[in-house]
Amino acid sequence: MLQPKRMKFRKMFKGRNRGLANGTEVSFGTFGLKAVGRGRLTARQIESARRAMTRHIKRQGQIWIRVFPDKPITSKPLEVRMGKGKGNVEYWVCQIQPGKVLYEMNGVSEVIAREAFALAAAKLPIKTTFVTKTVM
């Protein structure tokens, strides 16, 4: 699963997920899966969607993952009193703003790409849409 190799600080503030995204254009592949809503994707969700797409395209074509979970989420164990410091890191997330391209694909037909992205979108907690590369 995806997570940073090393970080300057182990734990992070909660923060807010406002604003618009960077990385809104399809830049590596021909087709892309773009976020319409905002939220956060866990490393498990990113990997689950990637596996669904890879299985559907049957090892032809190429897939790029354009998001990386770089924010640690902590939680305290069950039935522990409040206080005594922040909990341990449980999992990693990537904060998503509307317009962010999550995955890209190349080397397959548009029909197969649409089906693969539909399978991936079912694994994700945010609303997404299918986009193609615009050639100027």
Curated annotation (Swiss-Prot):
Name any one GO molecular function: tRNA binding
Q: Which InterPro entries match?
A: Ribosomal_uL16, Ribosomal_uL16_bact-type, Ribosomal_uL16_CS, Ribosomal_uL16_dom, Ribosomal_uL16_sf
GO terms under cellular component: cytosolic large ribosomal subunit
* KW Ribosomal protein (keyword) present: yes
PANTHER family, A to Z: 50S/60S RIBOSOMAL PROTEIN L16, LARGE RIBOSOMAL SUBUNIT PROTEIN UL16M
The subunit field of the Swiss-Prot or TrEMBL record says: Part of the 50S ribosomal subunit.
- Protein's name according to its UniProt entry: Large ribosomal subunit protein uL16
Species of origin reads Shewanella baltica (strain OS155 / ATCC BAA-1091)
